[in-house]
Each structure stands twice: as structure tokens, then as C-alpha cells.
From Swiss-Prot:
Cofactor (UniProt): FAD
Subcellular location per the Swiss-Prot or TrEMBL entry: Cytoplasm
Transmembrane segments: none
Domain annotation FAD-binding PCMH-type: ranges: 29-193
Keyword NADP: yes
Any GO CC annotation of this UniProt entry: cytosol
SUPFAM superfamilies xrefs: FAD-binding/transporter-associated domain-like, Uridine diphospho-N-Acetylenolpyruvylglucosamine reductase, MurB, C-terminal domain
Protein name per Swiss-Prot or TrEMBL: UDP-N-acetylenolpyruvoylglucosamine reductase
Function: Cell wall formation.
Record Gene3D superfamilies: 3.30.465.10, UDP-N-acetylenolpyruvoylglucosamine reductase, C-terminal domain, Uridine Diphospho-n-acetylenolpyruvylglucosamine Reductase, domain 2
Species of origin: Syntrophotalea carbinolica (strain DSM 2380 / NBRC 103641 / GraBd1)
HAMAP family tied to this protein: MurB
Gene of this entry: murB
InterPro entries found in the cross-reference section: FAD-bd_PCMH, FAD-bd_PCMH-like_sf, FAD-bd_PCMH_sub1, FAD-bd_PCMH_sub2, MurB, MurB_C, MurB_C_sf, Oxid_FAD_bind_N
Catalytic residue list: R173, S222, E292
Length: 299
């Protein structure tokens, strides 16, 4: 492992870390160690790293903002590639933009507000990066990535390929981004709007999100997808589960579709709590809730 880390270190400008606790990099503050943790500063470093990892047969996962993911307590036996270095962002005069996969969604929205570009303002306050937002077709209110996405640049061991939006097949919290590919950038299109109107709206959206979801404890956002014609939080509420806990994991008192780390929670606590919620909701309503959170790593 030290030899591989040294070889990766020759590629990267940032340090390669061994045994890095992933709890430091996830919004739940949960997760065991990564065998190797690396942070490419650009697409060239990323592709070179993927090529080397493929040569040695090392499994890997990408990690952006660390939201919408649960890392198991045993950590990840392989490489974790942090995409925070992919920060390029460029706009043209026609309201189109190319945005790096590591750019936080909120940072993009702020730039759009300054330029009077509308299309993602409903996502204000969403704790995600553009790369992760493309992979899961992140959405809020009446908007999602699919509404502004022209295409995405996907990196693999052999280089970067552009996929147009129709090939990405964005649906409700899903896309066709395949395993073994990382979103390095997204090509987006926006419509013109008043910067002043956008600024007011975005401020209101952030305030609304904080009021409705400001749980004050580590969490990963919404845990379950909304079933067709239903809202997951209402189904959970119908079972009177706010405050229900397993170990250090607890259904938020503020928002029923959030699970919070109330202190010392382990991934196993969260998984057991998810299973309990599913069982109780199915028993009461007949509906099986589908998790929105991706689970990675070993128990």
C-alpha cells in the first residue's frame, strides 16, 4: 500500500493519505478509514490516478461533499477519490456554463444570481457538489439538474468522455452515470432573470430550508426517496417516529426524513434505524420506502 501511495504521490500535488477516517469527510460524521485517500487538483491528475488504480486492480469510489452517502464502520478497502479539486467554472454570454464536478451547488447558485441566470435557485442551500448532483439528479422544489443539464464530462482510466443529457437518462434521483466514471464537469444552460429577484428568492429559499430542516446535528439530508404521489416524511410522521432512535442514530425531531447523529453514531446504527423505519411504514401504509442514501464500504 505504501508503494502505491508513493506512486500516486508522484502524480498528485496534494498528499496521499493512508488510513484516513472517512468520518472527517462525510456530513453524518460517520465512517471507518479509507485504505488510500487522494485529492486530485484537476482532471489530468484524476485520469492519471484512475489509470494507475486500474493497472493495480485497486477498487475506488468518488467522494464529493460527503452528503447522501453512508460509509460503513469498517471503512473502504480501496481508494477514496475526493473531487473537491475540480473547481473550474466558466460562463458564456448566452447563459451557458461549464462547471467543475467539485463545485458546491450553492457556490454555483451564487454566481448565477450575480449574472441573472435562473434554473437552479430552488436548490439553494443544498449541500452537494455538481458532480454528485448530476449522478443523483439532485432536485428541490420544482427544479432539478435535468432541467438545466446539456451534458457531462465523465472521467475513467482511459480519459474523459462527453455524455449528452439524453445519454445520461436523468430521472427521479437517478442517472445512467456508470460505475467506474467520475463527473469532472457539467455543461449547463440557464435562462435570463433579474439578479435582484433571484437574490431575494434564493435568500428566502435558504431561510425556508433552515427553518424546515435546520436540525443542528450531523445528517445526510433526506434519507428516503418520495414514493409516487407521496412524501416520505409524511409517511414516517404517520408512524410517529420523530425522535425514535437506534444507538446514536435518531429520526430528527425537526424533519422526519432526516436521520441525525446525536453523538457517537455508527453506520450500523443508521442502517438498523433505516430498516426499522421501513418496517414500520410498510406495516402501517403498505409502502416500502426506498433509501436515497448510498451505502459504501465494509461492515
Amino acid at each position: 500500500m505504501h508503494v502505491l501511495a508513493a506512486r500516486l504521490g508522484e502524480i498528485l500535488h496534494s498528499p496521499v493519505q493512508l488510513g484516513e477516517p472517512l468520518s472527517r469527510h462525510t456530513s453524518w460524521r460517520i465512517g471507518g478509514p479509507a485504505e488510500i485517500f487522494l485529492s486530485p487538483c484537476d482532471t489530468k491528475e484524476l485520469v492519471a490516478s484512475l489509470e494507475l488504480l486500474a493497472q493495480v486492480g485497486m477498487p475506488w469510489i468518488a467522494l464529493g461533499a460527503g452528503t447522501n452517502v453512508l460509509v460503513r464502520d469498517g471503512g473502504f478497502r480501496g481508494a477514496v477519490i475526493h473531487t473537491g479539486g475540480l473547481q473550474d467554472m466558466a460562463f458564456d454570454a448566452d447563459g451557458r456554463a461549464r462547471v467543475g464536478g467539485g463545485v458546491p451547488v450553492m457556490r454555483l447558485i451564487r454566481h448565477c444570481v450575480e449574472r441573472g441566470l435562473a434554473g437552479l435557485e430552488d436548490l439553494a442551500g443544498l449541500p452537494a457538489t455538481i458532480g454528485g448532483a448530476v449522478v443523483m439528479n439532485a432536485g428541490a422544489g420544482k427544479q432539478d439538474l435535468a432541467g438545466v443539464l446539456d451534458g457531462a464530462f465523465l472521467a475513467g482510466p482511459s480519459g474523459v468522455e462527453y455524455w449528452p443529457a439524453d445519454r445520461l437518462e436523468l430521472g427521479y434521483r437517478t442517472s445512467a452515470v456508470p460505475p467506474g466514471r467520475i463527473v469532472t464537469a457539467a455543461s449547463l444552460r440557464f435562462r435570463k432573470a433579474s439578479p435582484e429577484v433571484l437574490e431575494t428568492y434564493v435568500r428566502q429559499r435558504v431561510q425556508q430550508r433552515r427553518k424546515a430542516q435546520g436540525v443542528g446535528k450531523p445528517n445526510a439530508g433526506s434519507v428516503f426517496k418520495n414514493p409516487p404521489g407521496q412524501q416520505a416524511w409524511r409517511l414516517i410522521d404517520s408512524c410517529e417516529l420523530r425522535g425514535f432512535a437506534v444507538g446514536g442514530a435518531q429520526v430528527s425531531e425537526k424533519h422526519a426524513n432526516f436521520i441525525v447523529n446525536r453523538g457517537g453514531a455508527r453506520a450500523e446504527d443508521v442502517l438498523r434505524l433505516i430498516a426499522e423505519i421501513q418496517k414500520k411504514v410498510e406495516k402501517r401504509t403498505g409502502i416500502v420506502l426506498e433509501p436515497e442514501v448510498k451505502v459504501v464500504g465494509q461492515a
